[in-house]
Amino acid sequence: MTLTRPLALISALAALILALPADAERIKDLTTIQGVRSNQLIGYGLVVGLDGTGDQTTQTPFTVQSIVSMMQQMGINLPSGTNLQLRNVAAVMVTGNLPPFAQPGQPMDVTVSSMGNARSLRGGTLLMTPLKGADNQVYAMAQGNLVIGGAGAGASGTSTQINHLGAGRISAGAIVERAVPSQLTETSTIRLELKEADFSTASMVVDAINKRFGNGTATPLDGRVIQVQPPMDINRIAFIGNLENLDVKPSQGPAKVILNARTGSVVMNQAVTLDDCAISHGNLSVVINTAPAISQPGPFSGGQTVATQVSQVEINKEPGQVIKLDKGTSLADVVKALNAIGATPQDLVAILQAMKAAGSLRADLEII
């Protein structure tokens, strides 16, 4: 793969975004219901049955302490001063998300991660582990055989490893023991929260709800929260189901450019135009001139006068040149020009950062 391949993909994606129309979306895809959320759970446990790849107990005293405590609870007392040398046990942290409306007896997935110096959790079995919430209450119990996505092997001082061996998952490995109370059907109102705050989209959602269920049903509180007053003579759950399936055409959000500083990935959500600026970046030279063009129809033809923008792009690769960008130039043109001369994604990242600092980039710049 050449270095210009990522920028070519960026150019194609930018053109595709501009060509796609803004279609209507369901309210359930644009909003969440306040109070309907998952809850994070965490627990400490032991994984046994490892093939000599567990914790080195001399370096992880908490593993030995956990084993001794577990055996004492089972009625097995070890002699004082016993030095356990175990290689098939590993101390782990178990995490999971308790889904909304989960009831006792329902299964949930959990992730098991080594917290000691175990070389691999492959082939291990998680012993019964209580999972607690932020309130220190037990909401689920986890136990089961781990599934590890990686693989590793070694001999004569040489080893190789594919993917990560220190963490794995147990599908349906936890059983819910306690439900989180929900007040969704008890409150007099329902609050919808837009996933992306936008006053125009909030207004459109309110209009769609009021048009379907009557004026006064929905009221915007701000650019994100919408308060809904369900009718008293219908089932609350059926009302929410019908409400979530209403179609709304969201407004176009603000222009945004996302940069990944580690990989050089650049993503644009729409057309981005630039103000006048000049940038010198290494040996890159890009000059883009944009001029208005008027399309005048013939006399009595019934056509309309249309104003368009004509861009002329000149590309050079000479040391110490200046990148000149006139007002109205699109970011897509800049990407295409840089792609044509073999610039790397890191070059594009540096140039966009300079444009934003100079105030010529008409978009929110986010670096991840």
Curated annotation (Swiss-Prot):
NCBIfam families: PRK05303.1 (NF003676). InterPro entries: Flag_FlgI. This is Flagellar P-ring protein. Belongs to the FlgI family. The basal body constitutes a major portion of the flagellar organelle and consists of four rings (L,P,S, and M) mounted on a central rod. GO terms for molecular function: structural molecule activity. It holds the Pfam family FlgI. Keywords: Bacterial flagellum, Periplasm, Signal. Its main location: periplasm. The gene is flgI. It comes from Methylobacillus flagellatus (strain ATCC 51484 / DSM 6875 / VKM B-1610 / KT). It comes from the Bacteria. Disulfide bonds: none annotated.
